[in-house]
């Protein structure tokens, strides 16, 4: 059984994820024998999921095995009781926690490469699983031999080796291992694919499950093209405000994209601020209909902390505004520089004293101001509409009233002509 050892170097500290199953034990055996000179140091990681009664015996077996072969071993016991109590599927949660621990240990060990025992049959199973459960359009279709994590790489040296070859290798060298009895239970989708569907395909002389590898190659090339196109679009059309955790994109430019590229763009943008966003394709398609509608302003709640705000020609992803964090009313007794929400107010000393105290507040229903240079009044709400001011900006913009409670300034949109040079309002941070 030949490993693909191109993923590490002779001076690397390699770490092997060992479950005690036949695949990982055969991988470990090869690393200790035929490939013992291909690395500088070898360490084992083992996760005890604490779900099966055999887990304790497996962990103890691996401790003895590693001690006999002078291998450093680290074991982690996961607590999955919360998912079990709620009858949730533990597979995804276990995988997340497992890789969180791998990340932690690779950093602690200052290791270079993590090896896993995924093999050819795992690859075919994963391809089929992603096709049938609808997760093929926004993911690669299977495993890559090499993938990158924070500070290290994951390599899969058995990815071209079939399960049949692994079994033959184990029988030849009498390699000890444990069989997970749950792998035979077809109530789990992956087991059903592995134990029933793939063998049925292989029994038909006109069909070959291995042809899925060609589909994977084609699919992954298209996936990479989409990823590149999304990055190009983001670079050209998206503006970021890192401090405020705010980004905006041209609504028209976004609407002109094909739906497949829209999904990739949003996946990239949402993951920038919140890694656990998991928006379904169906939800995305509903959003796209709203984005392309004629409605000028509306919002979509992502979580309790994040929102998508549509404002005229802009699509904005931003943190939700917590009303308690913004000024609603402020009194100014004398000239000076003041901050109101995200605006800076410069009140000049030449402003007539009879106008003080000034009241600075956010908008209220029915607000009007006197037009400059002509008779009549205009509603503040109409001014916002004419200037295409986003809804959330309207809620923060300072409106300045004089002692008589007459509006003399509306943010950076309007100042009464007679006092224009003495009240200067600008967005905080603008030059």
UniProtKB/Swiss-Prot annotation:
Where does this protein reside within or beyond the cell?
A: Cytoplasm
State the EC number(s): 6.3.4.19
This entry carries the following GO cellular component terms, namely: cytoplasm
Residues annotated for ATP binding in this entry: 19-24
At the top of the EC hierarchy, this enzyme's class is ligase
* Alphabetically ordered keywords of this record: ATP-binding, Cytoplasm, Ligase, Nucleotide-binding, tRNA processing
Cite the InterPro entries for this sequence.
Lysidine-tRNA-synth_C (IPR012796), Rossmann-like_a/b/a_fold (IPR014729), TilS/TtcA_N (IPR011063), tRNA_Ile_lys_synt (IPR012094), tRNA_Ile_lys_synt_N (IPR012795)
Query: Under the GO molecular function aspect, what terms does this record hold?
Result: ATP binding; tRNA(Ile)-lysidine synthase activity
Reaction it catalyzes: cytidine(34) in tRNA(Ile2) + L-lysine + ATP = lysidine(34) in tRNA(Ile2) + AMP + diphosphate + H(+)
**Which CDD domains is this protein grouped with?**
TilS_N
Role description: Ligates lysine onto the cytidine present at position 34 of the AUA codon-specific tRNA(Ile) that contains the anticodon CAU, in an ATP-dependent manner. Cytidine is converted to lysidine, thus changing the amino acid specificity of the tRNA from methionine to isoleucine.
Q: What is known of its domains?
A: The N-terminal region contains the highly conserved SGGXDS motif, predicted to be a P-loop motif involved in ATP binding.
Q: What is this protein called?
A: tRNA(Ile)-lysidine synthase
Origin species, per record, is Staphylococcus aureus (strain MSSA476)
């Amino acid at each position: 059984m030949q490993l693909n050892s191109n993923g590490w170097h002779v001076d690397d500290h390699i770490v092997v994820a060992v479950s005690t199953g036949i695949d990982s034990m055969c991988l470990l055996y090869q690393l200790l024998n035929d490939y013992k000179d291909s690395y500088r140091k070898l360490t084992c990681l083992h996760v005890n999921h604490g779900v099966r009664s055999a887990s304790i015996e497996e962990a103890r077996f691996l401790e003895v095995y590693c001690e006999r072969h002078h291998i450093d071993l680290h074991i982690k016991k996961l607590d999955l009781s919360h998912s079990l109590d709620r009858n949730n599927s533990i597979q995804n949660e276990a995988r997340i926690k497992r890789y969180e621990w791998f990340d932690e240990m690779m950093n602690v060990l200052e290791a270079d490469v993590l090896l896993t025992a995924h093999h050819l049959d795992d690859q075919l199973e994963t391809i089929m699983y992603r096709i049938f459960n609808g997760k093929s359009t926004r993911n690669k279709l299977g495993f890559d031999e090499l993938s990158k994590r924070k500070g290290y790489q994951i390599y899969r040296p058995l990815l071209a080796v079939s399960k049949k070859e692994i079994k033959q290798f184990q029988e030849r060298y009498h390699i000890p291992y444990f069989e997970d009895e749950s792998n035979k239970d077809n109530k789990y989708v992956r087991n059903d694919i592995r134990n029933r569907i793939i063998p049925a395909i292989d029994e038909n002389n006109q069909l070959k499950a291995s042809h899925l590898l060609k589909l994977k190659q084609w699919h992954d090339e298209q996936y990479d093209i989409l990823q590149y196109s999304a990055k190009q679009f983001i670079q050209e059309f998206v503006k970021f405000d890192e401090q405020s955790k705010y980004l905006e994109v041209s609504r028209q430019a976004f609407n002109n994209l094909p739906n497949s590229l829209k999904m990739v763009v949003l996946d990239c943008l949402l993951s920038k601020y919140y890694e656990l966003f998991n928006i379904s394709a169906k939800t995305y398609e509903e959003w796209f209909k709203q984005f392309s509608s004629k409605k000028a302003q509306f919002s979509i709640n992502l979580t309790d902390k994040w929102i998508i705000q549509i404002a005229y020609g802009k699509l904005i992803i931003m943190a939700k505004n917590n009303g308690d964090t913004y000024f609603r009313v402020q009194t100014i007794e004398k000239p000076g520089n003041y901050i109101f929400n995200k605006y800076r107010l410069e009140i000049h000393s030449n402003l007539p004293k009879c106008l003080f105290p000034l009241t600075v507040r956010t908008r209220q229903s029915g607000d009007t101001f006197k037009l400059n240079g002509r008779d009549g009044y205009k509603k503040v709400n109409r001014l916002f509409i004419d200037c295409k001011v986003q809804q959330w900006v309207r809620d923060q913009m300072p409106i300045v009233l004089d002692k008589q409670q007459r509006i003399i300034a509306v943010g950076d949109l309007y100042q009464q002509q007679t006092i224009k040079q003495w009240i200067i309002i600008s967005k905080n941070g603008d030059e």
